[in-house]
Structure formats: structure tokens, C-alpha cells
Amino acid sequence: MARKMIRVLLVEDEEINRVVARAALKAAGGGDVVDEAENGEVAVQRVRDAAAPYDLVLMDKQMPVMDGHEATRRIRGMGVTTPIVAVSSDGLPADVDAFITAGADDFTSKPLSKEKLGVILAKFRLA
């Protein structure tokens, strides 16, 4: 039986962080299709315009144009149930709570790694 292709939306404004996340996703077995958005506004557009729903959204916190909290709220406001995992270098309880309140399903800290993403993929049954 063939493994399901995993579609991920990676929302991150820093190119180096996108490169690291993409490599970690591939190493963890979850990088079949990775679309990128450099800010929250583009992320909302990508989710809205996607031909098929994403299996996972990795959402940065601080970005220009629209931050991760607002993008998460807007995606949830569209009725999208795709797991959203907040990603930030700030792991303060207030930051985690703000993302969860906005509609995120989980939180992980930067830098992303094969191990961290492996746990996330397993949690959402994508591995």
C-alpha cells in the first residue's frame, strides 16, 4: 500500500529558516509537497486557494504584513480544520497561550529539527 503524500504549508518570513524547516521535514518523512508563504497574508491566500487541503500548517509567529496569530485566526475563521502548529523562538507561556487561543493545535520552538517534526507528524498521524 502506498504511503499518503503529505502536503505542508510552511509559513516563515526568513529564508534560512524555510531551508532548515524544509530539510527537517524531508528527513522526518513529511516533506512530499511543501508550499511556502513568507507572511500570514500569503498563508491565508494559499489555504483559501489550495486545490486540496493541506495536511499540516507550520506557522511562524513574527512576520511582516500579517503575523502568525492573525493568520491562524483567519484560517480558522474560514472553517479550515487542518492542524496548525505554531513555531517560534519565543517559548514563553504567554506566546503559547496566544497561539492556542488563536486556533493553533500545538506549539514548537525554533530551530525545527527532524526529531521535533517527527513528533509533530506522529501526533497528527501524518507519519
Swiss-Prot record:
Keyword S-adenosyl-L-methionine: no
Gene3D superfamilies the UniProt entry points to: 3.40.50.2300
PTM notes: Two-component system major event consists of a His-to-Asp phosphorelay between a sensor histidine kinase (HK) and a response regulator (RR). In plants, the His-to-Asp phosphorelay involves an additional intermediate named Histidine-containing phosphotransfer protein (HPt). This multistep phosphorelay consists of a His-Asp-His-Asp sequential transfer of a phosphate group between first a His and an Asp of the HK protein, followed by the transfer to a conserved His of the HPt protein and finally the transfer to an Asp in the receiver domain of the RR protein.
Top-rank taxon, per record: Eukaryota
Residues with the 4-aspartylphosphate modification: D60
PROSITE patterns recorded: RESPONSE_REGULATORY (PS50110)
Coiled coil stretches, renumbered: none
GO biological process, one term: cytokinin-activated signaling pathway
Domain Response regulatory: 7-125
Matches recorded under InterPro entries: CheY-like_superfamily, Sig_transdc_resp-reg_receiver, ST_Response_Regulator
Keyword Phosphoprotein: yes
Effects seen without this gene: Dwarf, narrow leaf and low tillering phenotypes.
Keyword field: Activator, Cytokinin signaling pathway, Phosphoprotein, Two-component regulatory system
PANTHER family: TWO-COMPONENT RESPONSE REGULATOR, TWO-COMPONENT RESPONSE REGULATOR ARR22
UniProt family annotation: Belongs to the ARR family. Type-C subfamily.
Record function comment: Functions as a response regulator involved in His-to-Asp phosphorelay signal transduction system. Phosphorylation of the Asp residue in the receiver domain activates the ability of the protein to promote the transcription of target genes. May directly activate some type-A response regulators in response to cytokinins.
Name this protein carries in UniProt: Two-component response regulator ORR41
Organism whose genome encodes this protein: Oryza sativa subsp. japonica
Gene: RR41
